[in-house]
Amino acid sequence: IIKNNQTISVFENISSGVISNSIKDFAKNNFNIGLTSGDKNISEFMKKYNFNISNKTPEQISIELAKFVRTLSSSDIGFAYYGITTGDENVQNLGQGESYFAIVDGTNNRTKHVRSAGIGIPDKRRAIMSSLSLIRNFLK
């Protein structure tokens, strides 16, 4: 990102900003914004900018969220993590649910689906690793 002089912004819904922090660590001043929000709030907010995530698959939602944060921040690259948890959310290593990752620029997008999601520390670590892997592969 720095080498290509590109900027990046991030949206995440269940990881409490840890993905944004990890990306900011390597992107430095090329990191624009990190946005964290729950489904209901972000859906209403996005409508004000003519983005709609209603009636879409989770993969489509992650792409729309990446496009949204890219547009909102005027970044070169938008990245989104959209996690859906199932089961007891108080468990530290939930490992259940679904994670959807998307990265977009002006012309390309790439997604990744992982059959694991949660709010515990191990879950967040898995989300960070999947995020960094997708970003690295996208930038190749």
Regions found by a protein language model. Give the residues of each.
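Short alpha-helical segments enriched in small residues
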Residues: 1-140
